[in-house]
From Swiss-Prot:
Keywords: Cytoplasm, Methyltransferase, RNA-binding, rRNA processing, S-adenosyl-L-methionine, Transferase. It comes from Bacillus subtilis (strain 168). GO terms for cellular component: cytoplasm. It is found in: Cytoplasm. The gene is ywbD. Pfam families: Methyltrans_SAM, PUA_3. Belongs to the methyltransferase superfamily. RlmI family. Its main location: cytoplasm. GO terms for molecular function: methyltransferase activity; RNA binding. This is Putative ribosomal RNA large subunit methyltransferase YwbD. The lineage of its organism: Bacteria, Bacillati, Bacillota, Bacilli, Bacillales. Its EC number is 2.1.1.-. InterPro entries: PUA, PUA-like_sf, PUA_sf, RlmI-like_PUA, SAM-dep_methyl-trfase, SAM-dependent_MTases_sf. Coiled coil: none annotated. GO terms for biological process: methylation; rRNA processing.
Length: 396
């Protein structure tokens, strides 16, 4: 077994359950390592055994711990144990009649960092986040085959190109190829999903509870603006909740046809709603000039985005984006402020919110908060894994 030696301070983090092996934690070079190598992680002070894991480059990490038992083998039985435990924890979701898509295995939260598995009405989607974890593909899929999942097919997304980008490929792995789009249900809402059309599927499963809240408690009789709307999933939830009108804005050309599709599978008249393909920042300027006001605004930008004209980073730019949102929010209107950035926590996010309102001389109250749903399992030792922060604010 190859050894990976960590600096003393970082060894203490691993001892407390931190699962990511950070680049800066290494005491010396990892030049002798190759992606997928199983490693024993030891402290530079006396060579104390800390954990067993694998080497795989991912963002700021060089791998993940898998067990703190030096006698445990990392084999098919290991993966089967982790997968079985994860499936058992989601038994209620498997049985649910009105929800047929959810996260089956959530990386380090379920014991194996660098890989996630989503369940889409009988289809499995595996996402690999490093070449290292990808070397365990056959072992992991064989473990899945030992389970009583009765899946229709397995698809995959390889997200380990330069800077963690998606590797364009035919994503079919095994089983019966799906005829896409398939229609999944989420709390009774129908969404069209394609597992073999690029990096994304058409729905972000981690926002399930937020869409339900919008439909059930916030949309009725309201004018709704959905920014960075992607396929319009929030807009559909609002329309089904009785919104007077929704406006969906996204810069991607594909968003128009995809949003029409999501309205149509729910038997909603998409022509009664506005779907705009344009830069959200330009739309804010347009709305301010036209003196438009919305009762409910959904603000869920990507953590990082680059267009021809600008670069957006949630960590740097969310406050200013929120200031523009506040300007077109009606009195007593609600803003769904959301971010999936793992670069900062809820406390800092609330700091952005507070600063935005102070700088616009407006007041607000927090009426509801969300983090990841229960199927996106996290561990307290790795707060970065609980990346989703959603705060519902009412403008006073």
């Amino acid at each position: 077994m190859k050894l990976l030696t960590l600096k003393k301070a970082h060894a203490a983090k691993i001892k407390k359950g931190y699962p990511l092996i950070e680049k800066e934690a290494l005491a010396g070079s990892a030049g002798h390592m190759k992606e997928g190598d199983l490693v024993d992680i030891v402290s530079e002070s006396g060579g104390e055994f800390l954990a067993r894991g694998y080497y795989g480059l991912q963002n700021k990490g060089v791998g993940w711990t898998l067990t703190r038992n030096k006698h445990e083998q990392i084999d098919q039985a290991f993966f089967l144990s982790k997968l079985t435990k994860a499936a058992q924890a989601r038994a209620k979701l498997f049985e649910a009649q009105d929800t047929t898509a959810f996260r089956l295995f959530n990386g380090e939260g379920d014991g194996v960092g660098g890989v996630t598995i989503d369940y889409y009405d009988g289809y499995l989607l595996i996402q690999w986040y490093s070449k290292g974890i990808y070397t365990f593909k056959d072992m992991l899929i064989s473990a899945l085959d030992e389970m009583d999942l009765d899946y229709k097919a397995i698809y995959e997304k390889k997200r380990f190109d330069t800077a963690g980008q998606y590797v364009e490929d035919d994503d079919f792995v095994k089983g019966r190829r799906g005829e896409f789009p398939i229609i999944i249900q989420e709390n009774g809402i129908q969404y069209a999903v394609d597992l073999n059309e690029g990096a994304m599927t058409g729905i972000f499963l981690d926002q399930r509870h937020v869409r339900k809240a919008i439909r059930d408690r916030y949309a009725k009789g309201k004018t709704v603006l959905n920014t960075f709307s992607y396929t319009g999933a929030f807009s559909v939830a609002a329309a089904l909740g009785g919104a007077e009108k929704t406006t969906s804005v996204d810069v991607a050309n594909r968003s128009l046809a995809k949003t029409i599709e999501q309205f149509s599978v729910n038997k909603l008249d998409y022509e009664a709603h506005d779907i705009k393909v344009m830069d959200v920042f330009n739309y804010f300027s347009y709305a301010a000039k036209k003196d438009l006001r919305f009762d409910l605004i959904i603000l869920d930008p990507p953590s990082f985005a680059r267009t021809k004209k600008r670069t957006f980073s949630a960590a740097k730019d969310y406050k200013n984006l929120l200031k523009e949102t506040i300007a077109i929010t009606a009195d007593k209107g609600v803003i769904v402020a959301s971010t999936n950035s793992s670069a900062f926590g809820m406390k800092k996010f609330k700091g952005f919110i507070d600063a935005a309102f102070k700088e616009t001389n407006e007041r607000y109250t927090i009426i509801e908060e969300f983090t990841l749903p229960e199927d996106f399992k996290t561990i307290s030792a790795f707060p970065e894994g609980n990346y989703l922060k959603v705060v519902l604010l009412q403008k006073k």
